Amino acid sequence: GLMSQQRAGKAIATGFLARQIAPIEVPEGRKGTRLMRDDEFPRPEITLEKLATLKPVFRKGGQVTPGNSSGVTDGAAFVLVGDRAALEAKGIEPVARIVDWTIVGVSPRVMGCGPVPAIRALWEKRGMKASDIDYYEINEAFAVVNLHAEKELGIGRDVTNIYGGGISIGHPPGATGVRMTITAMHHLQESGQRYACIATGGFDKL
């Protein structure tokens, strides 16, 4: 949880996340308004000591707390998807290409394990291995989801969710997958890298 907050804080400070956000004017007070330019959920100033005081949410003595779980937040995200011919007809220059995708189901009892078989299926489908993909966005429903994926897949923390994730940015229902895709697209554009993998639970795309 701490790393996610720190990474989101850095992404905000450098303007990386701002480049993905369309500012909107929202009501404030009885007659006023304000321009929202940044996500409100990140807490980059939080400390490990503060996180350690948070109580388990599912069972006594458990390890899942509000500090290592995603926040259910309001949000919206938008991308335009089309084939090359349609984009060319409209004079739209694509910024990324969906190479492939997989959908893999797991038992609801282990729903947090979904990214692992889904990513493996994608690797197998494309004849790829972990190191062939430059960057991974894996939804931080809970921190343990990412820890499990890193361990089982052998992918480094330095190539996964480096701008924060669901724990720090939030997990708006219906928008998270697109938000992650936009972040991955910006990462590829700014880094000059080629492939990113987005894993939202059991559906992955490259």
For every predicted segment, state its role:
Residues 46-113, 117, 124-125, 182-183, ...:
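Condensing-enzyme catalytic core mediating Claisen C-C bond formation in acyl metabolism
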Residues 28, 99-168:
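Active-site pocket-lining segment
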Residues 3, 7-10, 50-53, 118-121, ...:
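Alpha-helical scaffold segments in soluble metabolic enzymes
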Residues 1-5, 17, 43-47, 69-73, ...:
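Generic structural signal for well-ordered, non-membrane alpha-helical segments
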Residues 34-65, 104-106, 135-142, 167-179, ...:
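Hydrophobic transmembrane alpha-helix bundles
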Residues 1-89, 152, 157-159:
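N-terminal extracellular/periplasmic Venus flytrap/periplasmic-binding protein-like
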